[in-house]
Amino acid sequence: MARSLKKGPFADQSLLDKVAKQAKSNDKKVIQTWSRRSTIFPEFIGFTIAVYNGREHVPVYVTEDMVGHKLGEFAPTRTFRGHKKEDKKVKR
């Protein structure tokens, strides 16, 4: 179910504070966050945000096309190793 329009988009306040602080100081360090649920705002464009995927922080460079999406969409939590290869000797 989508978020109600009357509520508006959500972003973690600490993440907004970190982005505003770096924008003010013209600094482009990687911002670490655990907030996968935060919506990407236009103020985030040009920053690299390291999003936690459960094991490590995945660096995500924010572009204009990402605005409106969630940070967690760009840091996959599951790794697909491929389907098992079928053994041709056993199959008849």
Swiss-Prot record:
Belongs to the universal ribosomal protein uS19 family. It comes from Acholeplasma laidlawii (strain PG-8A). Protein S19 forms a complex with S13 that binds strongly to the 16S ribosomal RNA. HAMAP family: Ribosomal_uS19. Keywords: Ribonucleoprotein, Ribosomal protein, RNA-binding, rRNA-binding. This is Small ribosomal subunit protein uS19. It holds the Pfam family Ribosomal_S19. GO terms for molecular function: rRNA binding; structural constituent of ribosome. One of its GO terms (cellular component) is cytoplasm. Transmembrane segments: none annotated. PROSITE patterns: RIBOSOMAL_S19 (PS00323). The keyword Ribosomal protein applies. SUPFAM superfamilies: Ribosomal protein S19 (SSF54570). The lineage of its organism: Bacteria, Bacillati, Mycoplasmatota, Mollicutes, Acholeplasmatales. One of its GO terms (biological process) is ribosomal small subunit assembly.
